[in-house]
Amino acid sequence: MVLKQRANYLGFLIVFFTAFLVEAVPIKRQSNSTVDSLPPLIPSRTSAPSSSPSTTDPEAPAMSRNGPLPSDVETKYGMALNATSYPDSVVQAMSIDGGIRAATSQEINELTYYTTLSANSYCRTVIPGATWDCIHCDATEDLKIIKTWSTLIYDTNAMVARGDSEKTIYIVFRGSSSIRNWIADLTFVPVSYPPVSGTKVHKGFLDSYGEVQNELVATVLDQFKQYPSYKVAVTGHSLGGATALLCALDLYQREEGLSSSNLFLYTQGQPRVGDPAFANYVVSTGIPYRRTVNERDIVPHLPPAAFGFLHAGEEYWITDNSPETVQVCTSDLETSDCSNSIVPFTSVLDHLSYFGINTGLCT
């Protein structure tokens, strides 16, 4: 059954990547997603740094070094959909050598927990059902689900939960598991990021977050007002990781009480969200940002860096088909190391499992 689900999901993903050239029709946000009732932006937290990243295409060295893909490998934007073999340079890159530190067991346990939260969000019993009734739910059943969202246009799914033993307010965004989600994914159209002048982000991701922004921010800030000593952690897989990033920034920009000391961001298999100026702004906030990539997962390499997009956040790269083998690229902006070292030999299948947990399927 699981193999059948994986095959169906793989087929759908291939259709999705084939459809990338189709431009989505602009869709108006729902009336309850306006920003009218949101707290005002804090001017001192919405200024882009004057400096620019020194590297804007960190994938270029590996694209040149690893050579062209075999002619029989299906590709999109120069990346393999499912390369099954790769040159020695890629094998070497996936070893733990090379001066990049290994993640500690404590870090791996932490990342696994947030991956479990993200994976559980794919279960309808959790979102919108608001009950911990799923295969991995025993790991999160002590959390109280405050509210869930499942919107009509982009099918944005999210929840706010509270862990009293951990003293943490959790915000979890589901990734793509429906055609409507892929509509949000399939355009690479950059648009101005309204809070920060001079920066641009992926239009679909911005619109997806906009569908839940108003109510979600109000819910989180209400919880934070009741529990001001709690930290706030935002997480999501795939598209959910992209919206998680926008959410974390939104909270930082509107709530003085949230800062780098109590606001945290964890993503898994997250696509690139914005341009280099946006990535530089993300770094300037100081928000601890742990971005996990599984082996040769293609999604973190989209939209391509060559298209003017760049990741922020420390990269935690799962290698050698082992959840216990995780490299950490400690740079706040992505570099040519870690997962960028293996392009263009990427894979859709590696998007479906993180730390041995099925992501994208409620299994």
UniProtKB/Swiss-Prot annotation:
This is Lipase. Disulfide bonds join 123-362, 134-137, 329-338. Keywords: Calcium, Disulfide bond, Hydrolase, Lipid degradation, Lipid metabolism, Metal-binding, Signal, Zymogen. The lineage of its organism: Eukaryota, Fungi, Fungi incertae sedis, Mucoromycota, Mucoromycotina. Belongs to the AB hydrolase superfamily. Lipase family. SUPFAM superfamilies: alpha/beta-Hydrolases. One of its GO terms (biological process) is lipid catabolic process. Residues 1-24 form the signal peptide. Residues 43-62 have a biased composition (Low complexity). It comes from the Eukaryota. Gene3D superfamilies: alpha/beta hydrolase. It catalyses: a triacylglycerol + H2O = a diacylglycerol + a fatty acid + H(+). The active site is at 238 (nucleophile), 297 (charge relay system), 351 (charge relay system). Its EC number is 3.1.1.3. Residues 33-69 are annotated as: Disordered. PANTHER family: ALPHA/BETA-HYDROLASES SUPERFAMILY PROTEIN, FUNGAL LIPASE-LIKE DOMAIN-CONTAINING PROTEIN. Pfam families: Lipase_3. Residues 25-94 form a propeptide. Ca(2+) binds at residue 350. InterPro entries: AB_hydrolase_fold, Fungal_lipase-type, Sec_MonoDiacylglyc_Lipase.
